[in-house]
Amino acid sequence: MKKLIAVAVLSACGSLAHANTNIPNYNTDAHLYEFTQTYDLVVPKGSQGQTNLWVPLPFNGEYQQVKSIHFEGNYMNAYVTENNKYGAKTLFATWNKDAQKRDLKVMMVIETKDREPMVKGALENYTPPKDIQYSVDVQEYLKATPHIKTDGIVKEFPDKILGKETNPLKKAELIHHWFVKNMERDNSVLGCGDGDVEKILTTGVLKGKCTDINSVFVALARAAGIPAREIFGIRLGAAEKMGKYSKGAFGSANEQGIANVSGGQHCRAEFYLAGFGWVPVDSADVAKMRLAEKKSVEDKDTQAVAKYLFGNWEANWVGFNHARDFDLYPQPELAPINNFGYPYAEVGGDPLNSFDPKEFKYDYVSKKL
């Protein structure tokens, strides 16, 4: 059994899109989780050859820190890399074509902090600088990608929603509340959705899961001149604050704080305000709560959740990366990939079904410490 212990191997989130480091820290309650991932990869019928596995790992930042990481398995080789456009941290493991089993276990201890700038009143009197100039790393999140278009029908939506509003914070809030009123969750969608914004808006089927809804938020914000990005990650347990509105929509765990989170992948979003930094938002979870609890848009619980999730996040969740429409490293047969919120694997170039833990054969368990 090969083992590799790596403590503090996950450095800060690279150079991409840093917020203003001179502002106060508005992260509040801290949480500590033990997060264990177990893989026993199943070779698809008819596939043969070398097996390659790419696992997304959490980044370190002001609101989340990987305190330790340890991985072991019967792999031929395994290492951590950030060698991709977005610096998305990746554990890459490979098994030779004659391997009888393909085992990997990853154990992490992660500290997260609730992000609550809006709760703390940090944006109450926000006024944008007269001359807004974004750094090169922030400008990256104004650009279009194949799934995040910013012209054509995508540009038409914020033009209609925002009218003559010029304050970026108020523009983002108008976009968020448009989602609350107009987009719904569709549990039949595979995984977290593919987040094809142009397709969603062109068809007029304003439904989907978290990647669909929050990708539309990101695209509309970018089209309105506001830097924005998704963050692909996973829920780690129960939501102590938001749980009063729904026991299941925002994450759950047993009485011992243990949760099977194999299906807990969740995409969030954030937008950038000049002179302040990145602001959290999660329009998709408003739709998820509405569906789970059968609430109307006008219901007081819906409105309370919508208010909290603009400018705040509860940290029973950890983020992996902001990567979209990019190439993993080493490059797989499928390139580029849409996003990197799930593990990805190929056997002889044939992809495994990342969205089905039983078919792919992975098991994720989180425990609150």
From Swiss-Prot:
This is Uncharacterized protein HI_1048. Pfam families: Transglut_core. Residues 1-19 form the signal peptide. It comes from the Bacteria. Keywords: Signal. PANTHER family: TRANSGLUTAMINASE DOMAIN PROTEIN, TRANSGLUTAMINASE-LIKE DOMAIN-CONTAINING PROTEIN. The keyword Signal applies.
